[in-house]
Amino acid sequence: MCALRYLRPDLLHLKPYDAVPPQAADKLDANEFPWDWPVGFKQKLSLLWEKGIPSNRYPDAHHQGLKQAIAAYAGADPAQISLGNGSDELIRSLLIATCVGERGSVLVAEPTFSMYAILAQSLGIPVVRVPRHPETFALDLGRCQQAVAEQRVRVVCLVDPNSPTGNGLSTAEWEWVEGLPAEILVILDEAYFEFSQHTALPKLAEHPNWVILRTFSKAFRLAAHRVGYAIGHPQLIQVLDSIRLPYNLSAISQWAVQIALEHAEEFLADLPLIRQERDALYQALQELPGVRVWPSQANFLYFRVAGWDPQDLQRAWQELGTCVRCTGGGLRLTVGTPEENQRALERLRQILR
């Protein structure tokens, strides 16, 4: 029994999100972009910090300029945009807006991004976990539909392409999503949109119960600044802006996003190389004994190795200098620089030899 009797008992067993220390050698565990900002842009941001951002003043609380810039980039209206301190804050706000107060449960298809379940549990919201197909990682539509019918599902969480498995939603899965009742919020997490180039945005106007989440942490190389955004119905956006914490984005993070969007073409110019490296890694992993690797539409690959416990393999790899994420009964390998990718393969060959 916990000595602190004011704590909720269910939180005592909740595990925090696990992350590898930043000083790790080759960090291929967090789906970060492998290259930092170009020096010229970092200098521009540094000059803004030095000359244009008063440290004694709070940042822009309403993000109006940033909303306009994001709307222009995404092809949406500023009234459809809400910003969060990472997509995690937006997920939490969406769950508060829909499920808190015993209004319903959250449906997740696992393996998937773990923060949906973690945040729901932290808010005391029931989580309905439906396993994906063990070979294809497709949704089990029969069990999903049964959960919707029987478990008071208020929110369906879908990552497209899914993390950690890298697969996008199929035609049948989209048909199921489009048939969900209007009282269920569908969160469509497009964190890897820039890599997959697939978006639900063209159909958003037909489905006011859909909301898209995106991030600047991946393709725009802004993981250190923690900025995510939602695209949704203006009334939903108004609620999100009302319940989020005040001044949730630092001034320097807001300016970093502005700079990234002003130079989006330059920042996204390396995406073809990432896709090329991903495909080369996929082919190389396929050739290794006992390795089962799945195709990916994102900047990572998911695989399993026959005869190996994923955690043991993760530890062995990390001891040699490559960090990967162990999740969902397998390993997720982020696409790094060509040099990091080559070292990762050489070390894996050494382990499996």
Swiss-Prot record:
Domain of life: Bacteria
Cofactors: pyridoxal 5'-phosphate
EC number, as in UniProt: 2.6.1.9
Keyword Amino-acid biosynthesis among UniProt keywords: yes
One Pfam assignment: Aminotran_1_2
Top-rank EC class of the record's enzyme: transferase
UniProt KW keywords: Amino-acid biosynthesis, Aminotransferase, Histidine biosynthesis, Pyridoxal phosphate, Transferase
InterPro entries: Aminotransferase_I/II_large, HisP_aminotrans, HistidinolP_aminotransfase, PyrdxlP-dep_Trfase, PyrdxlP-dep_Trfase_major, PyrdxlP-dep_Trfase_small
Biological processes, Gene Ontology terms: L-histidine biosynthetic process
Pathway: Amino-acid biosynthesis; L-histidine biosynthesis; L-histidine from 5-phospho-alpha-D-ribose 1-diphosphate: step 7/9
Catalytic activity as recorded in UniProt: L-histidinol phosphate + 2-oxoglutarate = 3-(imidazol-4-yl)-2-oxopropyl phosphate + L-glutamate
SUPFAM superfamilies reported for this sequence: PLP-dependent transferases
Gene Ontology molecular function, alphabetical: histidinol-phosphate transaminase activity; pyridoxal phosphate binding
Subunit architecture: Homodimer.
Family: Belongs to the class-II pyridoxal-phosphate-dependent aminotransferase family. Histidinol-phosphate aminotransferase subfamily.
Protein's name in the database: Histidinol-phosphate aminotransferase
Lineage: Bacteria, Bacillati, Cyanobacteriota, Cyanophyceae, Synechococcales
Gene behind the chain: hisC
